[in-house]
């Protein structure tokens, strides 16, 4: 542990120099309008460092606050975070879920009573099967949503107990219900109409998805909205995610030619 700390101290000037080089490469843009974050690897990080599950989610929670600030400082307008999947919401132990929910609540309270959301005028929304969330968490979430509902400069969307397939199924059910009531005709249904039935009809398509931990998959994340997204996978666990990892993702995005399926 001592050697590791000494190594970090020695390498810190090199890191800051590289950070400056990266920023100079990307600072003139273009920047993605909507960034999706899959913050993966908290538990594996804890195992690798002989730490507890609580330590894992606490460190992941702190990192998310940091990354959110980086994105806002860069001028990113829309940020969506995959906080908890439907699969994990159903399969994780009650103890682990309570730990996750407690940190989500703590994060929302920091946003509600802190300055960052109001400084950048960030609208905060949640999507997913949020009825599965504890009542105290729902209360804070509702307060924050209400407090920021008129902000329109930035948007933070939290996907909690969320699954992309489930969202599409739920949208389809709503369309069928409206069709049976005579509110919609089959010939009227297109992509724009279908979007109106998603959890958040105003949520824009994602330009760049960033996933940590080295896993190369999307894990049922916003399937409708990432049809033409650029994907970037980082070989580091979420608690160790660095600013240079974010900037490398942005640099990769800037170098790609987006053809939107054409």
Curated annotation (Swiss-Prot):
Binding of substrate, residues: 41-45, 85-87, 92, 211, 217-219
Name under which the protein is recorded: Tritrans,polycis-undecaprenyl-diphosphate synthase (geranylgeranyl-diphosphate specific)
UniProt cross-references to InterPro entries, sorted A to Z: UPP_synth-like (IPR001441), UPP_synth-like_CS (IPR018520), UPP_synth-like_sf (IPR036424)
GO biological process terms held by the UniProt record: polyprenol biosynthetic process
Keyword set, alphabetical order: Magnesium, Metal-binding, Transferase
Enzyme Commission code(s) on record: 2.5.1.89
HAMAP family given in the database record: ISPT (MF_01139)
Family: Belongs to the UPP synthase family.
Cofactor(s) recorded in Swiss-Prot or TrEMBL: Mg(2+)
Enzyme category, top tier: transferase
Catalysis performed (reactions): geranylgeranyl diphosphate + 7 isopentenyl diphosphate = tri-trans,hepta-cis-undecaprenyl diphosphate + 7 diphosphate
Biological role stated in the UniProt entry: Catalyzes the sequential condensation of isopentenyl diphosphate (IPP) with geranylgeranyl diphosphate (GGPP) to yield (2Z,6Z,10Z,14Z,18Z,22Z,26Z,30E,34E,38E)-undecaprenyl diphosphate (tritrans,heptacis-UPP). It is probably the precursor of glycosyl carrier lipids.
Note accompanying the cofactor annotation: Binds 2 magnesium ions per subunit.
Superkingdom of origin organism: Archaea
Chain positions recorded as Mg(2+) binding sites: 40, 230
Gene Ontology terms for molecular function: ditrans,polycis-polyprenyl diphosphate synthase [(2E,6E)-farnesyl diphosphate specific] activity; magnesium ion binding
């Amino acid at each position: 542990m001592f050697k590791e700390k000494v190594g970090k101290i020695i390498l810190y000037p090199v890191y800051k120099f590289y950070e400056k080089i990266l920023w100079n490469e990307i600072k003139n843009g273009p920047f993605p309008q909507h960034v999706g974050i899959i913050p993966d690897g908290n538990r594996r990080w804890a195992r690798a460092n002989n730490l507890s599950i609580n330590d894992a989610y606490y460190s992941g929670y702190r990192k998310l606050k940091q990354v959110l600030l980086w994105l806002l400082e860069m001028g990113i307008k829309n940020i969506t975070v995959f906080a908890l999947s439907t699969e994990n919401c159903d399969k994780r132990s009650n103890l682990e879920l309570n730990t996750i929910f407690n940190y989500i609540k703590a994060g929302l309270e920091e946003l509600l009573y802190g300055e960052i959301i109001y400084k950048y005028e960030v609208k905060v929304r949640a999507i997913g099967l949020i009825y599965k969330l504890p009542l105290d968490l729902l209360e804070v979430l509702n307060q924050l949503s209400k407090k920021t509902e008129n902000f329109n400069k930035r948007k933070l969307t939290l996907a909690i107990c969320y699954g992309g397939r489930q969202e599409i199924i739920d949208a389809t059910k709503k369309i069928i219900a409206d069709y049976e009531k005579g509110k919609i005709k089959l010939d009227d249904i297109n992509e724009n109409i279908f979007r109106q039935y998603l959890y958040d009809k105003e949520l824009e398509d994602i330009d760049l998805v960033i996933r940590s931990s080295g896993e190369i998959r999307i894990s049922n994340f916003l399937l409708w909205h990432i049809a033409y997204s650029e994907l970037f996978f980082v070989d580091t666990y979420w608690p160790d995610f660095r600013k240079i990892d974010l900037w490398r993702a942005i640099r990769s995005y800037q170098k790609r030619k987006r053809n939107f399926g054409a």
